[in-house]
Swiss-Prot record:
Functional description taken from the UniProt entry: Part of the ABC transporter complex PhnCDE involved in phosphonates import. Responsible for energy coupling to the transport system.
Lineage: Bacteria, Bacillati, Bacillota, Bacilli, Lactobacillales
Family indicated by similarity: Belongs to the ABC transporter superfamily. Phosphonates importer (TC 3.A.1.9.1) family.
Enzyme class: translocase
Coiled-coil annotated spans: none
Protein's name according to its UniProt entry: Phosphonates import ATP-binding protein PhnC
Gene3D superfamilies given in the database record: P-loop containing nucleotide triphosphate hydrolases
Keywords per UniProt: ATP-binding, Cell membrane, Membrane, Nucleotide-binding, Phosphonate transport, Translocase, Transport
Pfam families found in the cross-reference section: ABC_tran
Length: 246
C-alpha cells in the first residue's frame, strides 16, 4: 500500500512540486497520473521510492515511512519498488539478459559485481521476467540492437526481476509510436492482472490512461484535482485539468 498524508514538496528554488497531497493506493491497483507538463506528475511518482524527498507530511509504502530512510536503508527499500523510466537506462553494448540481471546487483557482494558472477537463480529470474514481457527470444542480443519498444520491455523485465510488488513508471511510452505504445501498455495491464502488481505510472496520452488504468489521478499545479475511476472521467474534468490559466 502507498499512502500520502498531507505531503508537500518544495524545491530549493521555491517551486512547489506538490501541495497537501492525500492519497491511498492499494496493492494490485493500476493507477495512471495525468496532467500537463510541470503539473507534478513525475514529482509524485519519484517521491514514492525516495528519488525526491518530501518537504512535509507523511509518505508510507508497505508500512515503511519513506522520508525517514537514508543511505543503506533507502537503497534496500528501493530494491522492492521497481522503476521504469522514459529513457530505458540500459547498457547498450551488453546483452538483454545481463541488463535484466543488473537489477540483482544490490544483493551481490562487491567481488561478484566486479566480475559479473551472477547466480543461477539470478539468471532464472531474469529469463522468467523476459518471458513475462514476451522477449525471451532476445535474451542474448545486445540491448542497442533492439527497437524502442523492445528496449522499454527490457526495462520492464528488469523491474520485474527485482521481484517487487510495486512498479512505478515515469512516462514509459512517450517516446514510442502509437502501436508500440499500446503493446507496452498491454504488458503493464497483463502484469497487473496476472501477478497482482501495483502499477503507478504518469502518462501524457490521456486516451491510453483511460483505456488501461482502473483509476485516474489528475494533478494540476501540484494539487490533486481528480481521483477516481477511469470510467467516470468526463470531458469537463479533462478541460479543467488541461485548461491553461491566464
Amino acid at each position: 500500500m502507498i499512502k500520502f498524508e498531507n505531503v508537500s514538496k518544495i524545491y530549493p528554488n521555491g517551486t512547489k512540486g506538490l501541495t497537501d497531497v492525500n492519497l491511498q493506493i492499494n496493492q494490485g491497483e493500476f493507477v495512471a497520473i495525468i496532467g500537463t507538463s510541470g503539473a507534478g506528475k513525475s514529482t509524485l511518482i519519484r517521491c514514492v521510492n525516495g528519488l525526491n524527498d518530501i518537504t512535509s507530511g507523511s509518505l508510507i509504502v508497505n508500512d515503511t515511512e519513506v522520508s525517514k530512510l537514508k543511505g543503506k536503508e533507502l537503497r534496500k527499500f528501493r530494491r522492492h519498488v521497481g522503476m521504469i523510466f522514459q529513457s530505458y537506462n540500459l547498457v547498450p553494448r551488453v546483452t538483454v539478459l545481463k541488463n535484466v540481471m543488473f537489477a540483482r546487483v544490490p544483493d551481490m557482494s562487491l567481488f561478484k559485481v566486479i566480475f559479473g558472477l551472477f547466480s543461477k537463480e539470478d539468471k532464472l529470474v531474469a529469463l522468467d521476467s523476459l518471458n513475462k514481457v514476451g522477449i525471451l527470444d532476445k535474451a542474448y542480443i545486445r540491448a542497442d540492437q533492439l527497437s524502442g519498444g523492445q528496449q522499454q520491455r527490457v526495462s520492464l523485465a528488469r523491474a520485474l526481476s527485482q521481484e517487487s510488488e510495486i512498479l512505478l513508471a515515469d512516462e514509459p511510452v512517450s517516446a514510442l509510436d502509437p502501436v508500440t505504445a499500446k503493446e507496452v501498455m498491454d504488458d503493464f495491464k497483463r502484469i497487473n492482472e496476472e501477478f497482482n502488481k501495483t502499477i503507478l505510472l504518469n502518462i501524457h496520452h490521456v486516451e491510453l490512461a483511460l483505456e488501461y488504468a482502473s483509476r485516474i489521478i489528475a494533478v494540476k499545479k501540484g494539487k490533486i484535482v481528480y481521483d477516481g475511476p477511469s470510467q467516470e472521467v468526463t470531458k469537463e474534468i479533462l478541460d479543467e485539468v488541461y485548461r491553461k490559466e491566464a
